Amino acid sequence: MHAKTAYSFDMGAYERLMRRDYYHVRTGRNIMIFVTRQLPVNEPGETHLDRAAVWDGLVLKANNALPFVPSMTFCEVTARHSDTGFDRDIDFRRQRFTERITPEAPHRVVFTRIAGPVLGTIANEIEDDDDDLRLRFSFALTVEGVAGCSAAEQEYAGSMIGDYLKAVAATLGAMRRIAAGKAVPA
């Protein structure tokens, strides 16, 4: 297990930067990779989800991501800081992380990686209204030891984008199963 490291991120700066799909910023020796994707929640032929169902799904995912994120093999809440905020340990892509979870009801859940080999911030945001509901998954991650503009950086960013798009699809699928009254595996 990695030692806990204090990490903070300016969400206002993060939101301004999230207007593009992918880019990086040098942060000292390391590179911070920014990726954002916005996807429609309600595709034709799928179980319709309203804002409340999506919010409830994001809260469930924050507490136990295993049914929602295929690449995650372990998820355990380790400390509660308030009625809504907490820390959790996860295993993702065969690596252990500690994340601080901050739900901002009813529109965004922020996951701040405070320990592990890749630090940064991940946000899951509900956007627009029920007629055109969208889910934005964004991340700003510092990858230690990866040179900017390198093939390694592009490969890492590409694999993360692929993992997060799979997680979005799995998350929406789990939310639809819940909305349809079907059980979601724990």
Features from the language model and the residues they span:
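Hydrophobic ligand-binding cavity/cleft-lining segments
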Residues: 7-10, 14-76
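Hydrophobic residues positioned within well-ordered beta-strands of beta-sheet architectures
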Residues: 35-37, 86-88, 99, 122, ...
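Hydrophobic/aromatic beta-strand elements that line small-molecule binding cavities or substrate pockets
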Residues: 39, 74-77, 97-102, 120-128
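Beta-strand elements of well-folded, non-transmembrane domains
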Residues: 41-43, 61, 92-96, 141-145
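Short, highly charged C-terminal tails/helix-capping segments
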Residues: 74-78, 172-186
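Glycine-rich portal/gate segments that line the openings of hydrophobic small-molecule binding cavities
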Residues: 77-115
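Beta-strand/loop substructures that line and gate deep hydrophobic ligand-binding cavities in soluble
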Residues: 114-166
